[in-house]
């Protein structure tokens, strides 16, 4: 049996399904390239049949990724499989992942079929996928609530049809470790052709068991773990990549000789990137990547740490690429210093625009004095979303609030190269007043669905990141803004969302024009 545990990342498929607003193709590609540097073996990047946007993002990622295998999801339906193959065909190497529900509840209530029908559908789906690639994964949806006899029967049939990976998902997070481990053990010992395929596991965290179930499955013979960065995913989320990888690495007394290809020093950086781009804050006490994961407050713990780090630290923060911040970046620092800090954090220059980053850094350094590495990361990721094609940009903003009186604001923007000013009186607070002014300038009909403010850094001069989700003509758009001033970061978030709407409207107009020709 192989000693390498295959890491199958589904952040861009299962993880993205949990987001309030979809990622752009550019944002998905950023994450995919980061996952490639992290060393994931397989990345599942979308469900191409679901939308033209998903097809485009899968195709774009497939074109750029060279060192990881790109995978797309499809139901056990010919059309799904054909479209997935079409999106993936530009890849260096690709996998088609097809699935069908197998639990009695799903087979009878959702599919309205017999289990014999389901087995035949699985066989035909795998055979069709094998027309396009020799790397086919088959999943028994809701395997956690499927009888073991039926799991073994359909797994054997799928392998005989050509599946090279068979996935046994706990789709609704129902299983406890002992019973899930037993399912994997039964499959290992009862399926006669199991040596011709890799057993994969895909666990959800509804009962908080995703990591434990995945690790127990490995102990019972599974050799692929499906997971996401930070554990993001539907409902309570998926198995967290960083947790299973570091558990295997840290507990070699149990996982003797087993390892992954993951470059663990990239974990912190990728975790932060996914958190920021997906607008999914990481809880402070989150294992491995939370801000408190390596913090020791108790006096007794601190004393032990000073004497010997191993007293309370089972792994070092450096292992996941977490470095202590240095207070040596100021407005006097040059481009080389900024680039050096980005290099030290593991970024390559094609990950960001140094000119834009340095200009944003100087503005922030003038306000803050000292700039930290986490500030640079935030500036790089947020600013690179504000593209050169933006029609709307912020020039000047002022707001005023007097006790018991409505707030007022003055906003000056540049729209299509023309400077426009607007005064707004009667806002329910300064942010509302600024938003009223911007919407008056753009004449945009927008409904605010979500507003979230997060501090990036520490102290009174910390950056404030505002993430919003707005609705326009039935579609949702995400906006993000970053500044030391909350009102300014709020304005920038709205302008970011409006630019996304402008781009979407432009695409719709082009499509309409093409159809009419």
Curated annotation (Swiss-Prot):
The question of whether Zinc is a record keyword is answered with no
Q: Where in the cell is it found?
A: Cytoplasm
Q: Which GO terms describe its cellular component?
A: cytosol
**What does the record give under GO molecular function?**
2-isopropylmalate synthase activity; acetyl-CoA C-acetyltransferase activity; manganese ion binding
Keyword line: Amino-acid biosynthesis, Branched-chain amino acid biosynthesis, Cytoplasm, Leucine biosynthesis, Manganese, Metal-binding, Transferase
Q: Which Gene3D superfamilies match?
A: 1.10.238.260, 3.30.160.270, Aldolase class I
Q: Which residues bind Mn(2+)?
A: 14, 202, 204, 238
What processes does the entry annotate via GO biological process terms? L-leucine biosynthetic process
**Ranges where the record places region Regulatory domain:** 393-517
Pfam families, sorted: HCS_D2, HMGL-like, LeuA_dimer
Required cofactor names: Mn(2+)
The annotated pathway is: Amino-acid biosynthesis; L-leucine biosynthesis; L-leucine from 3-methyl-2-oxobutanoate: step 1/4
Q: What is its EC number?
A: 2.3.3.13
Principal localisation = cytoplasm
Residues covered by the Pyruvate carboxyltransferase domain: 5-268
Q: Which reaction does it catalyse?
A: 3-methyl-2-oxobutanoate + acetyl-CoA + H2O = (2S)-2-isopropylmalate + CoA + H(+)
In terms of SUPFAM superfamilies, this protein maps to: 2-isopropylmalate synthase LeuA, allosteric (dimerisation) domain, Aldolase
Q: Which family does it belong to?
A: Belongs to the alpha-IPM synthase/homocitrate synthase family. LeuA type 1 subfamily.
Quaternary structure, from the entry: Homodimer.
Q: What is this protein called?
A: 2-isopropylmalate synthase
Q: What is the lineage of its organism?
A: Bacteria, Pseudomonadati, Pseudomonadota, Gammaproteobacteria, Pasteurellales
């Amino acid at each position: 049996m192989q000693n390498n545990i295959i890491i199958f990342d589904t952040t861009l498929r299962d993880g993205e399904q949990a987001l309030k607003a979809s990622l752009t193709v550019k944002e998905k590609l950023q994450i995919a390239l980061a996952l490639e540097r992290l060393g994931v073996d397989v990345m599942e990047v979308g469900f191409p049949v679901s939308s033209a946007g998903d097809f485009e993002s899968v195709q774009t990622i497939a074109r750029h990724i060279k060192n990881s295998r790109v995978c797309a999801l499809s139901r056990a339906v010919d059309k799904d499989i054909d479209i997935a193959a079409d999106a993936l065909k530009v890849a260096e190497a690709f996998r088609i992942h097809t699935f069908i529900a197998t639990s009695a509840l799903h087979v009878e209530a959702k599919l309205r079929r017999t289990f014999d029908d389901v087995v035949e559908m699985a066989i035909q789906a795998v055979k069709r996928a094998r027309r396009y690639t020799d790397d086919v994964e088959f999943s028994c949806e809701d395997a956690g609530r499927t009888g073991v006899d039926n799991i073994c029967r359909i797994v054997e049939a799928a392998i005989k049809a050509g599946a090279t990976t068979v996935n046994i998902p706990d789709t609704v997070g129902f299983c406890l470790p002992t019973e899930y481990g037993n399912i994997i053990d039964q499959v290992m010992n009862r399926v006669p052709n199991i040596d011709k395929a890799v057993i994969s596991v895909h666990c959800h965290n509804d009962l908080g068991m995703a990591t434990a179930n995945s690790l127990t499955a490995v102990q019972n013979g599974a050799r692929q773990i499906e997971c996401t960065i930070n554990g993001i995913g539907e409902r309570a989320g998926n198995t967290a990549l960083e947790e299973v990888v570091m558990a295997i690495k840290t507990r070699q007394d149990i996982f003797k000789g087993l390892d992954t290809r993951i470059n663990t020093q990239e974990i912190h950086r990728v975790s932060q990137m996914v958190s920021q781009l997906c607008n999914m804050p990481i809880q402070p006490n989150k294992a491995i990547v939370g801000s408190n994961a390596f913090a020791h407050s108790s006096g007794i713990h601190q004393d032990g740490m000073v004497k010997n780090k191993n007293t309370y630290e089972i792994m070092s923060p450096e292992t996941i690429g977490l470095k202590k911040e240095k207070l040596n970046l100021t407005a006097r620092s040059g481009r080389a210093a900024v680039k050096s800090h980005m290099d030290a954090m593991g970024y390559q220059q094609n990950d960001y625009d140094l000119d834009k980053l340095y200009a944003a850094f100087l503005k922030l350094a003038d306000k803050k004095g000292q700039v930290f590495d986490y500030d640079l990361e935030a500036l790089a990721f947020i600013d690179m979303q504000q593209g050169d094609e933006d029609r709307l940009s912020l020039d000047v903003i002022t707001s005023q609030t007097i006790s018991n009186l409505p707030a007022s604001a003055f906003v000056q923007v540049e729209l299509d190269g023309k400077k426009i000013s607007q005064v707004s009186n009667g806002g329910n607070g300064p942010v509302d007043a600024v938003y009223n002014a911007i919407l008056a300038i753009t004449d945009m009909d927008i409904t605010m669905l979500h507003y979230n403010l997060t501090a990036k850094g520490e102290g009174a001069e910390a950056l404030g990141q505002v993430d919003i989700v707005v609705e326009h003509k039935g579609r949702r758009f995400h906006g993000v803004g970053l500044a030391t001033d909350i009102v300014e970061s709020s304005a920038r978030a709205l302008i970011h969302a409006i630019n996304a709407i402008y781009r979407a409207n432009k695409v719709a107009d082009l499509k309409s024009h093409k159809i009419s020709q």
